[in-house]
């Protein structure tokens, strides 16, 4: 999962959500982390993972982007192998394969056998699965996720831009109540302003004439941390300067166009 170029400061105003996610991970409770684009869903997960002990982090299997049922199943098996799962290693060795040709071994297996290995390997309840930018989730993948959650005893942490069927597909049935949801909305006013000041320093914008820049940025970003960071990063580029002023209208249009490109089915948004 890709991390933002602004480090821990991007988590300003998200401390409560981070605690909630840590608690859910400790309790092995599946969660939907939902909110608009650039609300910080990817960064929240990355920050939480970075704070886990190394042993626990190795057993967190992460996927980003769209996937078919088969692709997701193969990725989980691959994740179990690299997490050092003894059963998966035993199966690979028994078929006279190694890490060097693991992909070929996985490709040769039927979906039925891969599911059997997955369920047996995870029955001790040691792993966690994080899925970013997968939505909307098809019925077939939802059925696999339900098997992973209920049969394989493995919690699934999913990101989405909403919590309804229209936004995350059939997966809504896994996260049907607020108990299984973490909502990331706009940041509080004071936190958003603090992040703006940090980004101004980080991207060297304090040498520009920022009259009106802060208020325009807060308004156009909707107090979303990813929007603040990305627009400040763009503001550092000379093409958005008119003398020592920032051309906010052009910058905002380009930021929106970037967002549309990154949210297309073939790319990974942040």
Predicted regions and their residues:
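Conserved AAA+ ATPase core "coupling" helix
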Residues: 171-200
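Sensor-1/coupling segment of RecA-like P-loop NTPase cores
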Residues: 35, 130-174, 178
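Conserved catalytic segments around the Walker B and adjacent sensor/switch elements
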Residues: 52-67
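Walker A/P-loop nucleotide-binding motif
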Residues: 28-46
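C-terminal alpha-helical "lid" subdomain
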Residues: 32, 44, 128, 185, ...
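Conserved NTP-binding/hydrolysis module of P-loop NTPases
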Residues: 2-5, 69-98
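N-terminal pre-P-loop "Q-motif" helix
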Residues: 8-21
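Mid-core helix/loop region of P-loop NTP-binding domains shared across ATPases and GTPases
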Residues: 85-144, 148, 208-220, 227-228
């Amino acid at each position: 999962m890709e991390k933002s170029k602004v480090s821990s400061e991007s988590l300003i105003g998200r401390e409560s959500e981070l605690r909630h996610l840590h608690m859910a991970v400790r309790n092995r409770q599946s969660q939907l982390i939902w909110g608009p684009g650039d609300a910080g869903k990817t960064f929240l997960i990355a920050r939480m993972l970075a704070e886990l002990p190394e042993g626990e982090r190795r057993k967190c299997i992460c996927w980003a982007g769209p996937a078919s049922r088969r692709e997701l199943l193969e990725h989980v098996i691959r994740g179990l192998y690299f997490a050092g799962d003894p059963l998966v290693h035993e199966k690979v060795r028994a078929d006279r394969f190694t890490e060097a040709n693991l992909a070929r071994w996985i490709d040769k297996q039927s979906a039925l056998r891969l599911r059997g290995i997955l369920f047996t390997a995870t029955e001790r309840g040691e792993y966690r699965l994080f899925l970013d930018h997968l939505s909307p989730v098809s019925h077939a993948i939802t059925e696999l996720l339900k098997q992973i959650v209920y049969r394989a005893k493995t919690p699934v942490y999913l990101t989405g831009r909403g919590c309804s069927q229209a936004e995350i597909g059939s997966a809504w049935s896994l996260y049907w109540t607020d108990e299984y949801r973490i909502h990331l909305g706009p940041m509080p006013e004071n936190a958003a302003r603090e992040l703006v000041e940090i980004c101004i320093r980080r991207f060297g914008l304090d040498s520009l004439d920022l009259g009106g820049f802060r208020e325009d940025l807060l308004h156009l970003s909707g107090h979303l941390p990813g929007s603040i960071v990305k627009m400040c990063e763009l503001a550092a580029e000379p093409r958005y300067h008119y003398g020592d002023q920032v051309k906010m209208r052009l910058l905002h249009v380009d930021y929106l166009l970037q967002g549309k490109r990154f949210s297309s089915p073939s790319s990974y948004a942040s």
